[in-house]
Amino acid sequence: QGNSIPSLTAALREERLRNAALLMLRPGAFPEVCGRVCPSMRLCESVCPIPADLGGPVPIAALERFAADYLLDGGWDPWPLASNGKRVAIVGAGPSGLACADVLARQGVNVTVFERDSEIGGLLTFGIPSFKLEHALISHRRRMLERLGICFRLSTAVGRDISIKNLLQNFDAIFIGIGAEFPVTPNLPGLDGHGVVWARPW
């Protein structure tokens, strides 16, 4: 999903803070996360046409973060539609699974998310240090999603604790978002040597 940055900056300039935040908090978007972890200086901000001597580039990630925090800190919750009777199972509570759950729940779908870890977020929770992304943000997002009616079945591994066959029998659709669990192994000598530590366990 792309964000309309001109619309965001215009709303902020005119002090329409709620409007600015709602532009960012569309279904499936997590600006409170993206505004903190996105390498914006290498992406959108790197092509900003405003030169440095005029104050550029526009700090887009910081603006997204500010707008989202403004509304979320005030206790905003999205409103789901009435249930349409459809049931969807989502395997994996990482970013893609959470985004899918958010979009579906706001359309009235009954969503159950199965996650083998003890908390949602995937690498947002277990792969990014808290000085970069406060884990309280993920906990806050979980409470928001639960208020949308999303059910989280944590510490539940599909294939171990519940079968795919069971999901197929009890849900209208299944979304599998199990993420990038294993690192890309470089073709280098000494990878099994003393002092070599992989990022996620560290």
Give the ranges of each region predicted by the language model.
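Immediate flanking context of iron-sulfur cluster ligation sites
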Residues: 18-43
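Alpha-helix boundary recognition
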Residues: 25, 39, 146, 168-169
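Beta1-alpha1 glycine-rich phosphate/pyrophosphate-binding loop at the start
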Residues: 2-14, 24-25, 56-61, 90-158, ...
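Residue-level marker of structural boundaries
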Residues: 17, 29-30, 72, 129, ...
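FAD-binding core/adjacent interface of flavoenzyme oxidoreductases
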Residues: 8, 33-34, 42-91, 150-202
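Short hydrophobic/aromatic-rich motifs at helix boundaries and adjacent loops
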Residues: 16-19, 72-74, 112-114
